[in-house]
């Protein structure tokens, strides 16, 4: 016997969260809980404003229609990426296809003062990996901050993300302020320039490795080995079903590329599932999941070690 619940939720964000020039005051999303006999599976559907093609309202409509079809015996996944991902996670939990083991070692995210990151990394056991958003300020400032971090922590490897913010000139201004002796410790820089060709040229001219992120979701993207390209960053909420995520990881690994499972600012429930996916599909790579601190609460499932208060499912708005 099948049953299902759908919940709608809204989480207040910290004041400083800006996405593509838009301040994100709340994170809005949906949960689906599927039950069959004694088994249960959860999934999160939370399109990311400015990045997802679909809106929260569109996702809700598609999810409710899919749940009604599932209750009637139809299991075909929806095409909408955020819904396909959330639904496939719920189905995978229902059938024990998503392993319980999780990789909760998130690469810490530097959102402001580099001194805060230096202190956080001092206590980090093992491999020291951190992420810095660049492209939000002047490229020269970004270069100086990155150089400072690499100089201060000799065993640090940085992942940088520019979200296609730079022109070729801005990219050169950034690189000018990063000591060439430190550049090999930039694990990769995600999508430095507005076009893929400009990003490839940036990698050639600076010796700084790049990674594809937004490119993976463009219709003309193909997985090929390219000089200067070291990694792909896979955001499942923006990608689609678990099967599609697994296909992309497999394609990247076949080319010798690093595949990084990364957050689209999901709630704690979604983040714990991403940690399980990372342990399953990319066991040797620290995932990019250090986004929970941008929120004011956790929901339904806790992220281990987080001091944020937990909102129980009974406090959420039930739609079905």
UniProtKB/Swiss-Prot annotation:
This protein's UniProt keywords: Lyase, Magnesium, Menaquinone biosynthesis, Metal-binding
Cofactor: a divalent metal cation
GO molecular function, one term: O-succinylbenzoate synthase activity
Location of the active site: 133, 235
Catalyzed reaction equations: (1R,6R)-6-hydroxy-2-succinyl-cyclohexa-2,4-diene-1-carboxylate = 2-succinylbenzoate + H2O
Family annotation (PANTHER family): O-SUCCINYLBENZOATE SYNTHASE, O-SUCCINYLBENZOATE SYNTHASE-RELATED
Protein's name according to its UniProt entry: o-succinylbenzoate synthase
Gene (UniProt): menC
């Amino acid at each position: 016997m099948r049953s299902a619940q759908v919940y709608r939720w809204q989480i207040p964000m910290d004041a400083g969260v800006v996405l593509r020039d838009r301040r994100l005051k709340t994170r809005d999303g949906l949960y689906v809980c599927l039950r069959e006999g004694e088994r249960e599976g959860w999934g999160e559907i939370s399109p990311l404003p400015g990045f997802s093609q679909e809106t929260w309202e569109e996702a809700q409509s598609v999810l409710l229609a899919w749940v009604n079809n599932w209750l009637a015996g139809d299991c075909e996944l929806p095409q909408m990426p955020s819904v396909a991902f959330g639904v496939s996670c719920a189905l995978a939990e229902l059938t024990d296809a998503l392993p319980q083991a999780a990789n909760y070692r998130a690469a810490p995210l530097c959102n402001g003062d580099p001194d805060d990151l230096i202190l956080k990394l001092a206590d980090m056991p093992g491999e020291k990996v951190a992420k810095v958003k660049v492209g939000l300020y002047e490229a020269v400032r970004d270069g100086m901050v990155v150089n400072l971090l690499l100089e201060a922590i000799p065993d640090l490897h940085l992942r940088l993300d520019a979200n296609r913010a730079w022109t070729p000139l801005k990219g050169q201004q950034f690189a000018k302020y990063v000591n060439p002796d430190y550049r090999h410790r930039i694990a990769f820089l995600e999508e430095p320039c507005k076009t893929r060709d400009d990003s490839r040229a940036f990698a050639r001219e600076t010796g700084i490795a790049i990674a594809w992120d937004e490119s993976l979701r463009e219709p003309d993207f193909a997985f090929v080995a390219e000089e200067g390209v070291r990694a792909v960053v896979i955001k499942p909420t923006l990608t689609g079903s678990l099967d599609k995520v697994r296909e992309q990881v497999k394609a990247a690994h076949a080319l010798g590329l690093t595949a990084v499972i990364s957050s689209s600012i999901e709630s704690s429930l979604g983040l714990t599932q991403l940690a399980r996916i990372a342990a399953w599909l990319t066991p040797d790579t620290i995932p990019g999941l250090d986004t929970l601190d941008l929120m004011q609460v956790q929901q339904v499932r806790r992220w281990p070690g987080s001091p944020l208060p937990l909102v129980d499912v009974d406090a959420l708005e039930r739609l079905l």
